[in-house]
């Protein structure tokens, strides 16, 4: 696999995480660049690990991964999205002080994992291609970290303009991303 293909793959793998990061950034109280970098690092590390895990699983698990990855990603993103919509529509004051300054590690890790399930399947496929998995995983992780950091900062701008409705929008985005993953896999099977 040539370097251009690896870079293209890396950024393609980061698009779901970018969309989720916009939602996360909009749901926070004016996240600073350092917080955006922390979120980017968490997502980037998870996104770098999953193709390596997939690569080690190899062809033996290809059928299982192909049959279930989309359902797992859809379910996690649906639940996270519904939770964000619920939080965004609760009957409470829309004061910015109620927004968190940062999201907890486990919430970010679950979101990062949900957006990287497809990278697990890509890792399985990479096991059968002439590619250095460590270079590919590093590129995927760095691209994801960059895109998520930018996504959080974009979400900050959107959140400032939209207020609490931004959290609803973020939840809708997560549900759309999960639905798109499910649709792509189901339409490929049909």
UniProtKB/Swiss-Prot annotation:
| Location in the cell | Cell inner membrane
Asked if the Swiss-Prot or TrEMBL record annotates the protein with the keyword Cell inner membrane, the reply is yes
Q: Which domain of life is it from?
A: Bacteria
Membrane-crossing segments per the record: 3-23, 39-59, 65-85, 106-128, 133-155, 157-177
| GO molecular-function terms, A-Z | manganese ion transmembrane transporter activity
Which GO terms of the cellular component aspect does the record hold? Answer: plasma membrane
Concerning InterPro entries, the annotation shows:
Mntp/YtaF (IPR003810), Put_MntP (IPR022929)
Just give the chief location class: membrane
Q: Name one Pfam family in it.
A: Mntp
Task: Tell me which UniProt keywords the record has, alphabetically.
Answer: Cell inner membrane, Cell membrane, Ion transport, Manganese, Membrane, Transmembrane, Transmembrane helix, Transport
Q: Does the keyword Cell inner membrane apply?
A: yes
Topology in the lipid bilayer is annotated as: Multi-pass membrane protein
Briefly state the protein's biological role. Probably functions as a manganese efflux pump.
Task: Tell me its family.
Answer: Belongs to the MntP (TC 9.B.29) family.
Q: What name goes with this protein?
A: Putative manganese efflux pump MntP
What species is this protein from? Pseudomonas fluorescens (strain ATCC BAA-477 / NRRL B-23932 / Pf-5)
């Amino acid at each position: 696999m040539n370097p251009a293909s690896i870079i293209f793959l890396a950024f393609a793998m980061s698009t779901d995480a970018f969309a989720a990061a916009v939602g996360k950034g909009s749901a926070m109280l004016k996240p600073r660049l350092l917080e955006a970098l922390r979120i980017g690092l968490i997502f980037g590390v998870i996104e770098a690990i999953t193709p390596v895990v997939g690569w080690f699983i190899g062809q033996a698990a290809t059928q299982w991964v192909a049959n279930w990855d989309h359902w797992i990603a859809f379910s996690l993103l649906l639940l996270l999205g519904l939770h964000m919509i619920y939080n965004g529509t609760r009957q409470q004051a829309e004061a910015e002080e109620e927004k968190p300054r940062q999201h907890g590690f486990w919430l970010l890790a679950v979101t990062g994992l949900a957006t990287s399930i497809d990278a697990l399947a890509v890792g399985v496929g990479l096991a059968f291609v002439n590619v250095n998995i460590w270079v590919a995983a590093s590129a995927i992780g760095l691209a994801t970290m960059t895109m998520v950091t930018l996504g959080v900062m974009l979400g900050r701008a959107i959140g400032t303009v939209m207020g609490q409705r931004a959290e609803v929008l973020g939840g809708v985005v997560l549900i759309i991303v999960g639905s798109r993953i499910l649709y792509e896999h189901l339409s490929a099977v049909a």
